[in-house]
Swiss-Prot record:
PANTHER family: SOLUTE CARRIER FAMILY 35 MEMBER F5, SOLUTE CARRIER FAMILY 35, MEMBER F5. Disulfide bonds: none annotated. This is Solute carrier family 35 member F5. GO terms for cellular component: membrane. The gene is SLC35F5.
Amino acid sequence: MVPPRHHPGAGRPGALSSSPPFRLRSSKFSGIALQDLRKAFKIRLQMVCVFIMNRMNSQSSGFTQRKRMALGIVILLLVDVIWVASSELTSYVFTQYNKPFFSTFAKTSMFVLYLLGFIVWKPWRQQCTRGFRGKHATFFADAEGYFAACTTDTTMNSSLSEPLYVPVKFHDLPSEKPENTNIDTEKIPKKSRVRFSNIMEIRQLPSSHALEAKLSRMSYPTVKEQESLLKTVGKLTATQVAKISFFFCFVWFLANFSYQEALSDTQVAIVNILSSTSGLFTLILAAMFPSNSGDRFTLSKLLAVILSIGGVVLVNLSGSEKSPGRNTIGSIWSLVGAMLYAVYIVMIKRKVDREDKLDIPMFFGFVGLFNLLLLWPGFFLLHYTGFEDFEFPNKVVLMCIVINGLIGTVLSEFLWLWGCFLTSSLIGTLALSLTIPLSIIADMCMQKVQFSWLFFAGAIPVFFSFFIATLLCHYNNWDPVMVGIRRIFAFICRKHRIQKVPEDSEQCESLIPMHGVSQEDGAS
């Protein structure tokens, strides 16, 4: 009978099978290692969560910007359709009632319908009450400072105060004694002491961050109430909107009057083509008076505008059924209207930096009110000078003017300004070029107008300039023309590489004496 085999180290102290002290220490070490592993896993999980949240926030912000751009493009396309239909209806009205000033005055005065919002919309009435603002005076002051800080392009380091160095007082905690003294403490690793600096740096955030700090310390219902107030304080007051409307009332009326005069002298397609030159004026004015980063001047934007201007020249050289003299007058009125439209959109975007800051219906409501109160003496001036005789239209023409004013002016101008705020001022003005193919089709179908090949050759570059400007603004002022010029310049003027020449002693010098090594090898 063969006796059972025993492990060679089974009877020695400290063996795995029979040593209780080692089993106790190993279990303690495994517990400590498990706790460290859990802490490391928890920290790593938190880091992953933070990384995912940051990625989601960055993607959501980019998605929001893409949604704003897409919504603005859709709105501008809808405005183009409305404008072409309105232009055709205006041309029909001018065949029976050629009064551009009366038509412009009547349609602009219809903006006053937006002021009915003071009756049906409570936030508008709250902006006119002093008690509402006085009740929350402290919050409004903090919020105004917050919005003022948001509009400025400053970094966090520049907004911090000067550093203040204060000595640090450390309080050493009493060392904790282990509960179980039977455990071998010699095997437990000692915690390393970390030495900190005796001086700490203190910087104070600016007062513009007081609103966020205050909201972070409030309860959830209070925060929701303050957020509703924040939406109100972020907008301009009724008095401020009225002041802006008073200035832009004259600019907008002259721009629209020039457009109406152009429609009375030439075809709709030619007027829309020449009106697209507002992109050039917008590019120049936006570079001089930028409202945001999207208005920055780039060489690619200039090339897109030049492409549009080249198409405009071809369109102007094309023949049409009307006399050349009236075409010239209509072209001049179109260019004047394009310049005034550029002044209008650039200045209003510089005055109001965000679309949620200005109540667009209230703005146009005050424009209609000031137009109705201040511009009526123009009838007497034009009548007695013989430029336009005053005559009241018949019922059919009056109905066409009312419908055209409500849809082609009141609704379309609101949508166009909203689309400009969602995209950029350059895209909003170049959106006028998209009325070209629609107006061509409308003139050919309704008025049987024949255009030469120069007209179509000029319409194509004007049409594509809009999409070029949209892509450039979408990709954060991407300037491929400047990038290409820089690469070509770098390729032509590149420096020749220094090549190794055998006569150069420094290049041939070796740090290791190879001849010595070869001699030793040869000797061996």
